[in-house]
Amino acid sequence: MRLLCAAFRARFGPVGGAKHRLENGCSFNKRMVMAKKRVVVLYGGRADEHSISCISTAGVLGAMDTERFEPIPVGITKDGKWIINGEDPRGWNLDGGELPTVKITPESRPVMLDPSRGQDGFFIGEPSHINSADSGFGTSFVSMSDPEMHHVLTSLGHVDAVLPVLHGPYGEDGTVQGLLEMMGVPYVGCGVFASAACMDKHYTKVVLDAAGIPTAPGVTVDARNFTAADVLAEIEDAGLTYPLFVKPSRAGSSFGVTKVEKADDRETQQDRLAAAIATAGEHDWKVLVEQGIDGREIECAVLCPKAGDEPEASWPGEIVLDHQNDDQFYDFDSKYMDASASHVEVPANLPVSVLEDVRDVARRAFKAVDGAGLSRVDTFVTPDGTVMVNEINTMPGFTPISMYPKAWDATGVSYTELITRLIEGVLR
């Protein structure tokens, strides 16, 4: 894979070049800063969805209008290190091989933050700093009020906005959003509350139920402390019918999801539930047990580049499974690893009146959680036309086979225009 583009080599020069040292706190290359808006693109992260974030970023960087924006890809390793000059994410794809990850290369340099400096608070250390916890660089935070820092760090320059292409916990859950809020750096996407609430499916349901938006019936279980007998009794008290879907409350990309069918006896049923809860519990101690819905899974892309504007909804689409003999749900492999497993249909093959109902529910759900920027609202449409919200993804996938960009393309907004509108929305 190619190492990060020549623009970064030209910008930062040889590692350790004295001419690039920070002097008097001033950033460098002001002429380039004036020419284009500089956008840090965050990718990778500590979540299970790390590799999907990498693939999404490849799509985003490939679609970004480089006449308007200067993308600055900043990777986050699985153990949380922020780096620049690693492998170029533009070369990553879904080819059925090994999923990509953010790795430290000989040319990688750590990215560190001084929150007090806001949009000028991004700094770069030397390669030797990445793993040197003993020398004070084991953290991603620094204080440039320390004179010693001026001799060892380089300014990344003024950052106009951040595009966090991060999926799952430690990225899509309000944590990174809170950091950027604290720094005063404009960023694309939902704010702290919406990100946190939509990452936690239990609280998504709480908010939507309060807004009068239907969701799938279910119960919430603490995987750290439960008995299968108690869970089964709770399921029966709630009147849930089979099949059930057991899933982590705070995970995405179908990680840890198990379909549980009706058993012939209680003991077998309890065993199945216990196994499913244990699987989900590997990803989150909070586990949802939801009733399977007899309906079609219809997804709608919502766009609201500037917080407070009226959200727009795409034509809803449907993921159609092509392996008709498989009695499976749309799992991780179907989503990302097997391009032949499914295809996207936009608009979904439904009456226009039903499609408009889905769009209306998607907009209402987005507003109920105080959404901003973008989200993909996943719904169930039952045979009688009822629209139920399954979940809200505040940073939906941007892979080549992802619904979000495909839905907007079918609605008349190209991939490049989509990225442009999202970034320019936070710069207004």
Curated annotation (Swiss-Prot):
Q: How is the cofactor bound?
A: Binds 2 magnesium or manganese ions per subunit.
InterPro entries according to UniProt: ATP-grasp, ATP_grasp_subdomain_1, D-Ala_lig_Van_CS, D_ala_D_ala, Dala_Dala_lig_C, Dala_Dala_lig_N, PreATP-grasp_dom_sf
Q: Which UniProt keywords apply?
A: ATP-binding, Cell shape, Cell wall biogenesis/degradation, Cytoplasm, Ligase, Magnesium, Manganese, Metal-binding, Nucleotide-binding, Peptidoglycan synthesis
Q: Required co-factor?
A: Mg(2+); Mn(2+)
Ranges for domain ATP-grasp: 205-424
Q: Report the pathway entry.
A: Cell wall biogenesis; peptidoglycan biosynthesis
Q: What does this protein do?
A: Cell wall formation.
This one is known as: D-alanine--D-alanine ligase
Source organism per UniProt: Bifidobacterium longum (strain NCC 2705)
